[in-house]
UniProtKB/Swiss-Prot annotation:
To B.subtilis YqxC and T.hyodysenteriae hemolysin TlyA. This is Uncharacterized protein YqaM. GO terms for biological process: DNA replication. InterPro entries: AAA+_ATPase, DnaA_dom, P-loop_NTPase. It comes from the Bacteria. GO terms for molecular function: ATP hydrolysis activity.
C-alpha cells in the first residue's frame, strides 16, 4: 500500500507539472504572438486602426469630459490586457463587458507629420521656436517683435476669421523676423494642427518662373492654404526691391484672394509698409489692413539689431 500511495503522489505531481508546463507554453506562445503582432504594425497600441479600445468594470464611475463633450470612465484597462487574462479570471470577465474607445495618439502624430511635410519647412526650421529665441540684453524693438509674435499665436483661434488676422515683421535683416514667424508656424502645426505653407520669396519666385506649367496650381495652393508665410517679401538686391511687374502680379493674385476670404498671412520683409506702398499701393494697403493689429517695424543700429553682426549667439 505504501508503494501504491507513493506512485499515486508521484503521478499527481507529474500531472500538475505537465499542466504547469502547458500553461507556461500557452502563455509564452500568446506573448510571442502578441510580440510578433506588434512588430507587424507601425503603432503597437492601436494596430494601425487609429482607435484604442479599453475595458471598463461594471462598477466604474463615469464623468463628463467638457473638452470632448463625452462621458469618460474614471478607470479603464486596455483591451489587449483584458484578452491576455491580465485583468481578471475568466469567471469575472462578464464584469468587464463595457468598453470605451478613443482616438490613438498616433493619428495626431501622423497628421502633424503630414502637415510638416506639406508646409515646406526644413528640419532646421523645425527647431525655430519661441523658447530658443533670445531676448535677454537685446534692444526693445527685438523684444517688441517677440511679444507681438507670441501674442499673435495666442490670439490666433479667435482672430483667424477676422479682417485683421495677419502679422508682419518688417525692417532690419538678421533681427529674428524669420525665426519668430517660423515659431508661429511650428506651433500652429504641432499644437493646433493648422495647415501652413512656407514661401521663401526669392527661391519661391524663381521656382514659379522655372516651372511655368505648374504656376497656376502652385498659386492656387498659396491662395487656399489655411496660413501662408511669405518670407522676405520683395527682398532688395543692391538696395532695390525685387519687384518686377510679373512678381507683383503673382503676389497680388495670392493676396487678393486671401484678403477677400479672410485667410491669415505671416509676412517678413526688409521693407516698411511705406516702401511696399511705393511698389504697389493696393497691395501695400491690403497688407497693412490685414496686419494692422500685429505689425512691428525694426529700424536702428544694425550692429545691435542684426544678430549676424553682433554677439547674439
Amino acid at each position: 500500500m505504501a508503494i501504491n500511495k507513493a506512485v499515486s503522489i508521484d503521478t499527481a505531481f507529474q500531472t500538475i507539472m505537465q499542466e504547469l508546463r502547458e500553461r507556461s507554453a500557452r502563455f509564452l506562445g500568446t506573448k510571442q504572438a502578441v510580440s510578433e503582432e506588434k512588430a507587424e504594425f507601425d503603432c503597437p497600441y492601436c494596430k494601425d486602426r487609429g482607435i484604442v479600445v479599453y475595458r471598463v468594470h461594471k462598477d466604474t464611475s463615469w464623468h463628463l469630459d467638457e473638452q470632448l463633450d463625452l462621458m469618460v470612465p474614471d478607470d479603464m484597462v486596455s483591451e489587449d490586457d483584458f484578452l491576455l487574462g491580465k485583468v481578471c479570471t475568466p469567471d469575472k470577465a462578464s464584469e468587464w463587458k463595457d468598453t470605451y474607445s478613443k482616438q490613438c495618439e498616433c493619428v495626431r502624430r501622423k497628421k502633424i507629420a503630414r502637415l510638416m511635410a506639406a508646409s515646406g519647412i526644413t528640419e532646421e526650421f523645425e527647431k525655430l521656436l519661441f523658447g530658443n529665441f533670445i531676448t535677454d540684453g537685446k534692444p526693445d524693438m527685438i523684444k517688441d517683435a517677440y511679444e507681438c509674435a507670441v501674442e499673435y499665436y495666442k490670439d490666433f483661434q479667435k482672430i483667424k476669421g477676422e479682417r485683421q488676422n495677419s502679422i508682419a515683421l518688417l525692417g532690419q535683416p538678421g533681427s529674428g523676423k524669420t525665426h519668430l514667424l517660423t515659431a508661429i508656424m511650428n506651433n500652429l502645426i504641432k499644437k493646433k494642427s493648422v495647415h501652413c505653407m512656407y514661401f521663401p520669396y526669392v527661391e519661391g519666385m524663381g521656382d514659379l518662373k522655372a516651372n511655368f506649367d505648374n504656376l497656376e496650381a502652385k498659386l492656387d495652393a498659396m491662395r487656399k492654404v489655411e496660413v501662408l508665410f511669405i518670407d522676405d517679401l520683395f527682398k532688395p538686391i543692391n538696395g532695390q526691391p525685387r519687384a518686377t511687374d510679373w512678381q507683383v502680379e503673382q503676389i497680388q493674385s495670392v493676396l487678393n484672394y486671401r484678403y477677400l476670404n479672410h485667410k491669415p498671412l505671416l509676412i517678413s520683409s526688409e521693407l516698411t509698409i511705406d516702401e511696399i506702398l511705393d511698389i504697389d499701393e493696393a497691395l501695400g494697403s491690403r497688407i497693412h489692413q490685414m496686419c494692422r493689429d500685429y505689425i512691428v517695424i525694426i529700424r536702428g543700429d544694425r550692429m545691435q539689431l542684426n544678430h549676424r553682426l553682433g554677439d547674439w549667439e
